[in-house]
Amino acid sequence: MHHHIKALLQSALNIKNTIDIVLERPKNKDLGHFATPLALSLAKIEKTNPKLIAEEIAKILTNYAEFEKVETLNGFVNLTLSTTFLQHIAQKQLQHCMTLEADSINPNISQYTQKTQITPKEHILIEFVSANPTGPLHIGHARGAVYGDALTRVGRFLGYDILTEYYINDAGAQIYMLGLSIFLAGREHILKTQVEYPQSYYKGEYIIDLAKQCALHFGEDVFKSEDSISSLADFGKDMMLQEIKDNLAQVGIKFDSFVSEKSLYDRWQDTLDTLKSHQGIYTKDGKIWIASSQINDEKDRVVVRENGEPTYLAGDIIYHQDKFHRHFEHYINIWGADHHGYIARVKAAIHFLGYDENKLEVLLSQMVSLLKGGQPYKMSKRAGNFILMKDVIEDIGADALRFIFLSKKPDTHLEFDVDELKKEDGSNPIYYINYANARIHTLFNKAGVNMQQTAQNANKLDINEQAKALLFEALCLQQIIESSFRNREIQKICDYLKSLSASFHSFYNTHKILQSPNESSILYVLMIVSQSLTLGLSLLGIKAKTRM
């Protein structure tokens, strides 16, 4: 709809491609569906009175069937779309992105993408979660996980070629510490030997569980010698990675690729040589440093210690060299907010590797504060000082978790009470949206609607003004989707779904629908509303409910 109107304005008014045509939604709905400040922009270029230009634009556009009314106000041109045009857009939307069966509406996202993709879009690599395989996923990981997955779903819907990737941090001190923690837990709980734990060891019942699994796999003698720590670390890492994959599957997340840090380390010398060839590293005090302060970092960083061991940063440098060597057009990393200071040093490394660091976009995900009945959510005994993603899914369900985590910008702090998401009223957004869709399908069932037949006869229907307003709102989803991906603001889809649901509930409560003179036209409009609710939820990774 937005693209059609913009293209019409450009063609009808002979506007150059260099001029941006803006369509705004007026706060006062009486002013029309859209307002454009195009006359103000043209007036600056032509040094002319914007009111005169606006009047000339209105005079031209009045002749087009897309508009029921065209008016001017303070240099703006206000556009009220015709019912015929809205019905035309609705028909296209039904055909492109939904499969209509006699009694149901199903998303057909791949078909939509094929039909609407005009030009090839970017090949993008999105890396997210990438939690160390040293423990279970907590709710901080969960927020970045559902955000990365939803961003991928929306991007693919719009025709972007996206590959999702999980970087496995399976090298370095944290993996050794996992093995040591399992070893000591085995000695204490299986061999019943008194042990002294280091300050930075991994805590929680999951470590004891891993020790018991290691005893079954290797035998109890594995805890008698420190020589087994490496084997215990590898076994524990593999077990935790599988648990992470299982946890992600619970919320519908599956990665296209997993890349092991350990598998990349045989390239470290080649990576150092490349950095050196671009004057990116130097030796000082027995260490090798990357000159990241030259590329917007606050200081240079150590990449190799005095003992010859690479630092944590070295692993990320090798990984990003591997990423950029695969020649994607754009790279998106979704990191925890505590990694904010890491962005500049990684971008500096990309620069010194000979790649364009501006192709890397880093999005940050803030932590989550959870309440239950107004009190802090109980920490997991299994994980120690964390709230596990798995526990919250069991408490409120995957759909509620996905929606609430996507309902705010990821770089803002999120606090919510899980008990609110169990309520069956308007205070629970996912219930409110699903209830709207279920109400619509109840109407379809009572009326015995054949959706295919209703869609085919749409042009014969007489839609009144109230239903037309609801139809217009239901047709705004495409623009919301495009904006949400362009600005990386998936919460816009959540806001739209809540708003559309509220508009439907208001319409439902104030209008007689079944056995009314306008029954057929209203049910057709509600078909479009249901389509938008179903598709919007699908892009968030949530299956819309048709009965509750």
Curated annotation (Swiss-Prot):
Monomer. This is Arginine--tRNA ligase. A motif ('HIGH' region) lies at residues 131-141. Belongs to the class-I aminoacyl-tRNA synthetase family. GO terms for biological process: arginyl-tRNA aminoacylation. It is an enzyme of class 6 (ligase). One of its GO terms (molecular function) is arginine-tRNA ligase activity. It is found in: Cytoplasm. It catalyses: tRNA(Arg) + L-arginine + ATP = L-arginyl-tRNA(Arg) + AMP + diphosphate. Keywords: Aminoacyl-tRNA synthetase, ATP-binding, Cytoplasm, Ligase, Nucleotide-binding, Protein biosynthesis. Pfam families: Arg_tRNA_synt_N (PF03485), DALR_1 (PF05746), tRNA-synt_1d (PF00750). Its EC number is 6.1.1.19. The keyword RNA-binding does not apply. One of its GO terms (cellular component) is cytoplasm. It comes from Helicobacter hepaticus (strain ATCC 51449 / 3B1).
